[in-house]
Amino acid sequence: MTKKKAHKPGSATIAQNKRARFEYAIEEEFEAGLSLQGWEVKSLRAGKANISDSYVTFRDGEAYLFGATVSPLNVASSHVVCDPTRTRKLLLKKRELDSLLGRVNRDGYTVVALSMYWKNAWAKIKIGVAKGKKEHDKRDDIKDREWQTAKSRIMKHANR
């Protein structure tokens, strides 16, 4: 028997944070590289990552990803002590780092992880500069989404 793939063969997406788009209003998106260890790369290839509660913090002029979980494989990480929730350094250009740091410190924004994916052979993470939504904003989004589905359903039946 063959093993079930963790993600679609043609898909480069490793993990998504769907909750972030609901909880936050995303202003701007950046692509960052990840500083990973060998066992983490193998686990990411198997699709064993979770970024649902992850966010970015800044220390000493560097950006770090907190809260992302990469579950170790049993066979790949038998000789190494694995920490699934360790902080991982993000690889960004200096201008992008300064822009992110300025917006977080001045304007009250936060930086959240949106998705993790493969770009060629490199693991990348899409991060977004976000501001938290209020409860009524979330309700408005739900109403708009429901109206769009109802409208498409009406148009589908009207064209028959």
UniProtKB/Swiss-Prot annotation:
Its main location: cytoplasm. Pfam families: SmpB (PF01668). SUPFAM superfamilies: Small protein B (SmpB). GO terms for molecular function: RNA binding. CDD domains: SmpB. Coiled coil: none annotated. One of its GO terms (biological process) is trans-translation. The keyword Lipid biosynthesis does not apply. Residues 138-148 have a biased composition (Basic and acidic residues). It is found in: Cytoplasm. It comes from the Bacteria. One of its GO terms (cellular component) is cytosol. InterPro entries: SmpB (IPR023620), SsrA-bd_prot (IPR000037), SsrA-bd_prot_CS (IPR020081). Residues 138-160 are annotated as: Disordered. Keywords: Cytoplasm, RNA-binding. Belongs to the SmpB family. Required for rescue of stalled ribosomes mediated by trans-translation. Binds to transfer-messenger RNA (tmRNA), required for stable association of tmRNA with ribosomes. tmRNA and SmpB together mimic tRNA shape, replacing the anticodon stem-loop with SmpB. tmRNA is encoded by the ssrA gene; the 2 termini fold to resemble tRNA(Ala) and it encodes a 'tag peptide', a short internal open reading frame. During trans-translation Ala-aminoacylated tmRNA acts like a tRNA, entering the A-site of stalled ribosomes, displacing the stalled mRNA. This is SsrA-binding protein. It comes from Serratia proteamaculans (strain 568). The lineage of its organism: Bacteria, Pseudomonadati, Pseudomonadota, Gammaproteobacteria, Enterobacterales. The gene is smpB.
